[in-house]
UniProtKB/Swiss-Prot annotation:
One record GO biological process: tRNA modification
Quaternary structure (record): Monomer.
Keyword Nucleotide-binding: yes
EC number, as in UniProt: 2.5.1.75
Protein name: tRNA dimethylallyltransferase
Gene: miaA
Region spans: Interaction with substrate tRNA: 36-39
Entry binding sites for substrate: T13, A14, V15, G16, K17, T18
Gene3D superfamilies, sorted: P-loop containing nucleotide triphosphate hydrolases
Family: Belongs to the IPP transferase family.
Organism name: Streptococcus pyogenes serotype M28 (strain MGAS6180)
Length: 299
């Protein structure tokens, strides 16, 4: 079976994945697939760091604005949607470029979690429904029985982990349809932290507070509201924090999230990282993609 070549850009939040994705899309006739669990939601643009209108005009983006904030979204959903997007992009002779920071989503796609021929999807759905009926105590016991330890346990993450454990044998035997070039972006910790702090400041200047307040007033308990970028501002709305304190909390949580992202990518994916402050950074990445695609450099 000839595998489909795809480019996957990973790295901590605020490192510049979107900008690189657009640059590669322009250079290699590509289209971008968002691999971010929060960017699927309509009306949540600023806090999710969704590509701006100008950026979306520069390159076609898929899997953004495909769910209402009241809807849930899982790794299983992402894999099904990403499969369809990849097939569509390839059918038009273009290069799929996945840009994302949700490690479980990317791993599920790249390691065969999506293959209906190998994994009984009806069994997956039935098992998920069974888990969703459990209360938190019973769900936690299931994690212990399966020797699963996950950081910051919540129901959504616990169910995902149990699904992967339950169908591990099928997943190990599944053959992915894709040949990925995984490009990792990173830099010194302080460089990343400074970029995060600056981006949070820009988000607040551009209307994040209003976006978060709308979510808090209308849908404070939905899955989308639990994402970093919104829940940190909720205490400000009820007078439990000053805006400065809430902003600092958001920056701190985002920095911690970036650290967890890097840990995930280093431990779970075969990725070589490139420093974004290296003088030859853009050219090095473009050369890697060109070699991957078997193209010659234009004179």
């Amino acid at each position: 079976m000839t595998k489909i070549k795809i480019v996957v850009i990973v790295g901590p939040t605020a490192v510049g994945k979107t900008a690189l994705g657009i640059s590669l899309a322009k250079a290699f006739n590509g289209e971008i697939i968002s691999g971010d669990s929060q960017q699927v939601y309509r009306q949540l643009d600023i806090g999710t760091a969704k590509a701006t209108q100008e950026e979306q005009e520069a390159a076609v983006h898929h899997l953004t604005d495909i769910r209402e904030v009241t809807e849930s979204y899982s790794a299983y959903d992402f894999v099904q949607d990403a499969q369809k997007a990849i097939s569509d992009i390839v059918s038009r002779g273009k290069l799929p470029i996945i840009v994302g920071g949700t490690g479980l989503y990317l791993q599920s796609l790249l390691e065969g979690y999506h293959l209906g021929g190998q994994v009984d999807q009806e069994a997956v759905k039935a098992y998920r429904n069974e888990l969703e009926q459990l209360d938190d105590h019973d769900l936690y016991e299931r994690l212990q029985v399966n020797n699963i330890t996950i950081e910051q346990v919540n129901r959504r993450r616990a169910i995902r982990a149990l699904e992967l454990a339950q169908f591990a044998d099928e997943l190990e035997n599944a053959e992915t349809a894709y040949e990925p070039l995984i490009i990792g972006l990173n830099d010194d910790r302080q460089v990343i932290y400074d970029r995060i702090n600056q981006r949070v400041d820009r988000m607040l200047e551009n209307g994040l507070l209003e976006e978060a307040k709308w979510l808090y007033e209308h849908y404070p308990t939905v899955q989308a509201s639990r994402g970093i970028g919104y829940k940190e501002l909720f205490p400000y709305f009820v007078g439990e924090m000053t805006l400065a304190e809430a902003s600092d909390q958001l920056k701190q949580n985002t920095r911690r999230f970036a650290k967890r992202q890097l840990t995930w990518f280093r431990n779970r994916m075969a990725v070589s990282f490139t420093a974004i402050t290296a003088p030859d950074y853009p050219q090095v990445v473009h050369d890697r993609v060109r070699d991957f695609l078997g193209q010659k450099e234009k004179s």
